[in-house]
């Protein structure tokens, strides 16, 4: 990759980070903050502290900047300018849009659409290979020094924030916060992976040649033949592996059943498939 293209890719990443952070901030201000939904993360902490008179944007800056510095000191220099940009820009947009009118005062709608907005924003930030800092950095620090998995660290931090929201506000607000956390996490997955999930099929059949040719000719998908041995008989039992689009999966099942009704088929969701016939990286 030449210098010009590399520069364009870096600029694209920063555009993603800034757009994603802006979407996250606006979603926070129009859905979550006015309805007191502390849906995890630094935004959740700032929602709780806002009820005591602290400005949400200031709280986010006060937490994000020291955490970024701690991350650089304790975890090394991998937290570069992209994380700093997200950590600073998100609270800035929260501050600039603090007087925007709430989109709804219905807590359930706020939790759902706030979670969607936050998820879209954070997902776009991740597409730019960036971060908005906050509790994600705290979780990585705890992960390094406690031995707990990163997922558990994030769950513990978000869980503590939700429980605190239940104490400060009420149990119902805490439940809405849990819903917001769930919706945002699922939306992040959709933004990163997309809706077009594929299916991976592992086919064990005595008619592997016929099945392979049918898949190649009738569905126009590639097939990989994997050598395997039956655990009960110790006989060679080749496995055919193929990945098809969700709309092609029904046709695949019909083809296999027509050729070999006794075929053993294992199916799994392939959340992201790159390469010939599928989307590019």
UniProtKB/Swiss-Prot annotation:
Q: Name one Pfam family in it.
A: DUF2179
What keywords tag this UniProt record?
Answer: Cell membrane, Membrane, Transmembrane, Transmembrane helix
Q: Does the keyword Transmembrane helix apply?
A: yes
N-terminal signal peptide: none
Alphabetical list of PANTHER family matching this protein: UPF0750 MEMBRANE PROTEIN YITE, UPF0750 MEMBRANE PROTEIN YITT-RELATED
Q: What is its main location?
A: membrane
Annotated localization: Cell membrane
Q: What is the protein name given in its UniProt record?
A: UPF0750 membrane protein YvjA
- Transmembrane region positions? 14-34, 56-76, 77-97, 108-128, 149-169
Traits of the deletion mutant: Cells lacking this gene show no apparent growth, sporulation, or germination defect. Also shows no defect in the synthesis of the membrane-bound CccB cytochrome or any other cytochrome with covalently bound heme.
Looking at the keywords, is Membrane present? yes
> Its membrane topology, per UniProt?
Multi-pass membrane protein
Family, similarity comment: Belongs to the UPF0750 family.
Query: One GO term of the cellular component aspect?
Result: plasma membrane
């Amino acid at each position: 990759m030449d210098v010009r293209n590399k520069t364009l890719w870096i600029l694209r990443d920063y555009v993603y980070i800034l757009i994603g952070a802006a979407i996250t901030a606006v979603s926070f201000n129009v859905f979550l903050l006015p309805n007191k939904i502390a849906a995890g993360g630094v935004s959740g902490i700032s929602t709780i502290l806002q009820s005591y008179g602290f400005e949400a944007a200031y709280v986010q800056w006060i937490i994000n900047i020291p955490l970024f510095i701690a991350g650089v000191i304790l975890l090394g220099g991998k937290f570069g300018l992209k994380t700093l940009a997200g950590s600073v820009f998100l609270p800035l947009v929260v501050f600039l849009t603090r007087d925007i009118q709430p989109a709804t005062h219905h807590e359930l709608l706020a939790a759902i659409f706030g979670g969607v907005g936050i998820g879209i924003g954070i997902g776009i930030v991740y597409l730019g290979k960036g971060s908005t800092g906050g509790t994600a950095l705290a979780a990585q620090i705890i992960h390094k020094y406690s031995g707990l998995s990163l997922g558990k660290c994030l769950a513990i931090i978000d869980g503590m924030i939700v429980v605190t929201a239940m104490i400060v506000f009420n149990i119902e607000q805490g439940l809405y916060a849990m819903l917001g956390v769930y919706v945002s996490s699922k939306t992040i997955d959709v933004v990163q992976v997309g809706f077009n999930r594929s299916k991976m099929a592992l086919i064990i059949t005595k008619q592997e040649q016929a099945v392979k040719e049918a898949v190649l000719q009738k569905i126009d998908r590639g097939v990989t033949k994997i050598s395997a041995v039956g655990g009960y008989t110790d006989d060679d039992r080749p496995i055919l592996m193929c990945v098809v689009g969700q709309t092609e999966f029904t046709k695949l099942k019909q083809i296999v059943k027509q050729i070999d009704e006794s075929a053993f088929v294992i199916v799994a969701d392939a959340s992201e498939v790159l390469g010939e016939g599928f989307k590019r990286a």
